[in-house]
Amino acid sequence: MNLAAVALLLVSLCKPGVAQSAAAPATSPAPGATPQSTQPSQDPPDPSADNGSVPRIRVGINEVNVVFTVTDKHGKRVTDLKQADFQVVDDSKPAVEIRSFHSETNLPLQVGLLIDASNSVRDRFKFEQESAIEFLNQTIRRGYDQAMVIGFDATPEVTQDFTDNTEALGHGVRELRPGGGTALYDALYYACRDKLLKKGRAGPTRRAIILLSDGEDNLSHVTREEAIEMAQRADAIVYTISTNVSGTKGAGDKVLERIADATGGRAFFPFQIRDVTNAFAEIQDELRSQYDVSYKPADFKADGHFRTIEIVASDRKNYRVRARRGYYAPVAQ
């Protein structure tokens, strides 16, 4: 290399800022910029991934949220009670602190409509479709609530994903045609895991699933209790409407009762066709007349275990409280 070339190389290496730029950390934010978070994503993890992760629900390390319904001894909803009228018991211990308590009559809804489209419901399927469409038209508010439609026989089928467009939802309901066997538990599991959990929440939201079925299941890969667990993880209240028209409660009706009871919902048994519409109307009214409480549990452990919830009314003689039976604690990161 000649002297002129060496001199040119030395000049270029000594230019201000060259060495500093090469050594500067790529993650250093500019003054006033918001640094990139190093925390894990807050989106629910993919429950289908075999990584042992626990799907998130509305539970923080120091706060639990639960929605509940109160009725009097005649079954009429009670909507004017105060925080002092209740005690929250978490895993057999009173809550350390009540963070908030109020009547929730106007929270946005995420509603999943699960319709049994197996051969066993063929006789009254058309009427149930029209009742479901009327419910969606009356309940879903444009720009505020969202709903989806899933039909199931041997497998679940999403005929309309989450939308606030009631016309599209109605079309999704009318697309369903009865036929085939019944995989009820798989459908509930799928709706909670693959739809509700993956959708997440943009803010305070109430989740509800309305399940129309006779409660019979002959094809599912998951069990009833696994389906219930996934609904609890998704923080979904499940309302069940029986399509059994025999006039007596069978084994399927007991399944529907179990699912509703475990998630804080309610089971309806409309033995006459016109009662299906009444059941939908009851659900619509209840979704707008519930209570919401956030509290700090005692001796909380972020270990992924199931913790029981009991909302106790001070006047137990006259009031009945209906809430989900518990929740799965998140796992500490």
Report residues per predicted region.
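Sec-dependent N-terminal signal peptides
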Residues: 1-20
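Scaffold/interface architecture of coatomer-like assemblies
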Residues: 19-333
